[in-house]
Amino acid sequence: MNQLKNDRYLKALLREPVDMTPVWMMRQAGRYLPEYKATRAEAGDFMALCRNADLACEVTLQPLRRYALDAAILFSDILTVPDAMGLGLSFGAGEGPKFARPIENKAQVDNLPIPDPESELQYVMNAVRTIRRELKGEVPLIGFSGSPWTLATYMVEGGSSKAFTKIKKMMYADPKILHALLDKLADSVILYLNAQIKAGAQAVMVFDTWGGVLAHNEYKEFSLRYMHKIVDGLIRENEGRKVPVTLFTKGGGLWLEAIAETGCDAVGLDWTVDIADARRRVGHKVALQGNMDPSVLYAQPERIELEVKQILAGFGQGSGHVFNLGHGIHQDVPEQSPKVFVDAVHEYSKQYHK
């Protein structure tokens, strides 16, 4: 594989010295870019775009042509794994995901297959291989998956949810069924992420989008426990280099110490967390990723730069910070805002790495 020209992102995740703070954006390949909309229209629909390795590669590379980002992230969806389990995933126009066959009982859980990443999910691996080739070693490629808890919320609710009543009912009334589902999902995610690493992903990230809806003890039992299992099962070195893993629970600021205990290399922070406080709490153990409120990108350039400076100052001197948004970029931000953001991170972070 190609030698990396810019490994700032990988070094920061391992808390090794860098010349400036690396930056990328969650959902950086997406609807805020006009060229993405054109490629998606060419594909026909969202899952067709995910399943076409050349088009998935194209949308992965689009933001890198505009902005000086320090990493590329595979263009895919967290719901590829449950889709490969046969739940009948669809995306209606202007709607969120829907499953035709949501999980309601033990028999369904028992009958769920663990997908083979090189057969049912081969289209994802083909995309990873294609992207890695086309990146030509410019920046590292991040692979990813949803967390078992987050995947389970969609599988049990049948789609997106605001109250999570079905899965919480299962959690409190039939916890054994939910644990069996989460265990199967953890095994599936381990296979899936390891296959991405073998195909060329140089770092991986687990998105626990809905972990923050859980009560304190339930978070540890139903979300963190299974992310810990994943961390334990991952390939941590490939191509003669460490493969860092980042765990991100949206709304997870209460549990940073517990997340850091899993053995992950980095913890993602949403925008509700004070990064200075987070570094005091867990910075001796893990790198931190985040954590500007994505809505700041609606502001004037000076305001964006001010926010960047405040977060950089909050983290302070030295490596161990990957700058990012606290969640995915919004689709209607002004076109120049991401450039202002990325350039500000690079310009104003140099002083913290002398």
UniProtKB/Swiss-Prot annotation:
<feature type="binding site">
    <location>
        <position position="154"/>
    </location>
    <ligand>
        <name>substrate</name>
    </ligand>
</feature>
<keyword id="KW-0456">Lyase</keyword>
<feature type="binding site">
    <location>
        <position position="209"/>
    </location>
    <ligand>
        <name>substrate</name>
    </ligand>
</feature>
<comment type="function">
    <text>Catalyzes the decarboxylation of four acetate groups of uroporphyrinogen-III to yield coproporphyrinogen-III.</text>
</comment>
<dbReference type="InterPro" id="IPR000257">
    <property type="entry name" value="Uroporphyrinogen_deCOase"/>
</dbReference>
<keyword id="KW-0963">Cytoplasm</keyword>
<dbReference type="Pfam" id="PF01208">
    <property type="entry name" value="URO-D"/>
</dbReference>
<dbReference type="GO" id="GO:0019353">
    <property type="term" value="P:protoporphyrinogen IX biosynthetic process from glutamate"/>
</dbReference>
<feature type="site" description="Transition state stabilizer">
    <location>
        <position position="77"/>
    </location>
</feature>
<feature type="binding site">
    <location>
        <begin position="27"/>
        <end position="31"/>
    </location>
    <ligand>
        <name>substrate</name>
    </ligand>
</feature>
<dbReference type="GO" id="GO:0004853">
    <property type="term" value="F:uroporphyrinogen decarboxylase activity"/>
</dbReference>
<dbReference type="InterPro" id="IPR006361">
    <property type="entry name" value="Uroporphyrinogen_deCO2ase_HemE"/>
</dbReference>
<feature type="binding site">
    <location>
        <position position="77"/>
    </location>
    <ligand>
        <name>substrate</name>
    </ligand>
</feature>
<comment type="pathway">
    <text>Porphyrin-containing compound metabolism; protoporphyrin-IX biosynthesis; coproporphyrinogen-III from 5-aminolevulinate: step 4/4.</text>
</comment>
<dbReference type="InterPro" id="IPR038071">
    <property type="entry name" value="UROD/MetE-like_sf"/>
</dbReference>
<keyword id="KW-0627">Porphyrin biosynthesis</keyword>
<dbReference type="GO" id="GO:0005829">
    <property type="term" value="C:cytosol"/>
</dbReference>
<comment type="subunit">
    <text>Homodimer.</text>
</comment>
<protein>
    <recommendedName>
        <fullName>Uroporphyrinogen decarboxylase</fullName>
        <ecNumber>4.1.1.37</ecNumber>
    </recommendedName>
</protein>
<comment type="similarity">
    <text>Belongs to the uroporphyrinogen decarboxylase family.</text>
</comment>
<keyword id="KW-0210">Decarboxylase</keyword>
<feature type="binding site">
    <location>
        <position position="327"/>
    </location>
    <ligand>
        <name>substrate</name>
    </ligand>
</feature>
